[in-house]
Amino acid sequence: MTLEQKGLKKQSITVAYFFDTIGKEHDIKLRRLNSVDEQKRRIFERDLHRPGLALAGFTNLFTYKRVQILGNTEMRFLNQHEEDARKNAFGNFVRFKIPCIILTSTNKLQPELLAMATEAGIPVFSTRHSSTKTMYLITEFLDNQFSLYQQYHGSMVDVYGVGVLLKGRSGLGKSEVALDLVERGHGLVADDVVVIHRKGESMILTAKRNKNIEHFMEIRGLGVVDVKANFGIRAIRDAKEVQVVVELLEWNKEMEYERLGLDTKTTKILGVEVPLVQLPIFPGKNITVIIEVVALNFLLKHYYDYVPAEALTKRIRTAIDQ
């Protein structure tokens, strides 16, 4: 796969998956208040909705496909009505195919209203968190779920805190280089299949491992290596920002390669420009050490705006001018 390919995105997730997963990834605990088939309800959008106007009867442009948040304001509005008016307002609300309802700040739904939601097949949950915190955590979760992503053939390594994505055709030794970097104290994020996410309009790309492959590597001539078992917990990372792409190339004497490093190359991943370093491979070349230097050069430029090639060029020009 080329790095320039178009990203993918989930179209929806089930409410059952939402309920089972969000508590594992964020500091929020949802309590189930009714029993309905949560597999039949799907969430299509990352945005949430507080349905004050819908409860008041104004349902034009009601974004019912979003997760509905009922906080202190919405519950106070319902509770101030007599039972018939309250049921009428809530009935007008649950006639839409809502994914689910979440009550915040430990608010409670009257039994008759909960029964109406159950009859409509709408899951109802509650949380002790405030509406503000609940919406922040759920939006963060849904942002991750609906982010652009793509799978790439390569290896992802944390080198001196810099996220380095190794790419190149099969058989060039990407896995061997990644393994050598791990042995030298760096951390493996993923090998063979690298899953890269871009959340919203952010310019940050996050690389993760394929959950089926985990931290296993295939080394030609050796077989499968379990990096976590062999090198311990220090040798693995769950995720890392993609900051530099290193492309391994077959040596071709007819081709001209970068010698000074003055020309900065980039490659585009999910619409984000990432620095690209192309390294030709030939016998005796220590690729591992070179990749460590690539990471150190990135840190020098990032923190001090220092580029060795530019510094050398400036020094030579100064000497000539003298």
Swiss-Prot record:
Signal peptide: none annotated. Pfam families: Hpr_kinase_C, Hpr_kinase_N. GO terms for molecular function: ATP binding; magnesium ion binding; phosphorelay sensor kinase activity; protein serine/threonine kinase activity; protein serine/threonine/tyrosine kinase activity. GO terms for biological process: regulation of carbohydrate metabolic process. Homohexamer. Belongs to the HPrK/P family. HAMAP family: HPr_kinase. This is HPr kinase/phosphorylase. It comes from Chlorobium phaeobacteroides (strain DSM 266 / SMG 266 / 2430). The gene is hprK.
